[in-house]
Amino acid sequence: MNNKLLQTLNSALGRTKTTHYSLVTIDALQARLTEELDWLDACPGRECLIILLQELAAKMHSARIVVNPGYSYLPDSYLLFLTGVTKVNPVEWDLPFGRFTKSVHDGAEIPFEAGTGCLEVARKVLSGRENEMVIETEPGLFEISFLDGVELMNVKLRITTYAELDRFTRTIKEGWHPLDQATLRLFSRGATDGAIFFESDKMREWLFDFDPESMSDLVLLSALYWPGRIELFPEILRRKQSGDYGKEFRDTYGIPVYKEQADDPSLALKGHLIGRTMMAVEALWPYRNKTKLK
């Protein structure tokens, strides 16, 4: 730990007007930063979350939006301030140093399922703005409007979570890969804590019932979990469990789901609705058949 950082922090604490702080020790600061880094290391999905938060913060700053205090995840972490996720220096905002020395992560994981979790983050960031409105115009594309004084501001923000998967895999520590068999086994039991693209209760239930045997199965579940296709799950589950499907559309158990299947002229005879392709399908397409559980 850099002593210069400690001096900077203690100097800032000493300048606060409304609260008296005792000096922070190098051990206390090191412990907090270690805790946050350990939290990131515990699940690769959390590192992806930080990347997405950085992108979101950059978009907000470019639209003259100030990330203000009031929510635990964004403002009260000195580590997130140092890495640029938030521009709010928690010391200058006179937030108690006790927040630096205890975990603030319980319940703070934001599910970015199909991009909709960005909606919640945007609302947190825009706290205190007048006439704030955030809508998702299409999967992963958000239109944010708010009043800045008397001026109506508008910003469009695109964060397609699944499209970030390849970049996320390049940033995680060596030895873990989204296609490894241990991860597939965990997912087959619905153990998806910290896996931000499979966090909902319904998806956990699906994973438990479906018992995915390959990355292809995981991609299929992601693609099904969307309005217009979610009702296909019971039939696909039945076909997987019974083996009642032919060679056509084998990856999706005989029912067309993916975008490229829409180009098949025989699809008109099937009577199945195909919605917009999930980003997961596009991002994971090269890997879909490479990993099978033994």
Located regions from the model:
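Mg2+-dependent phosphoryl-transfer active-site scaffold
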Residues: 1-17, 37-38, 55-60, 67-70, ...
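Helix-rich "cap/lid" substructures immediately adjacent to catalytic or cofactor-binding pockets
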Residues: 25-68
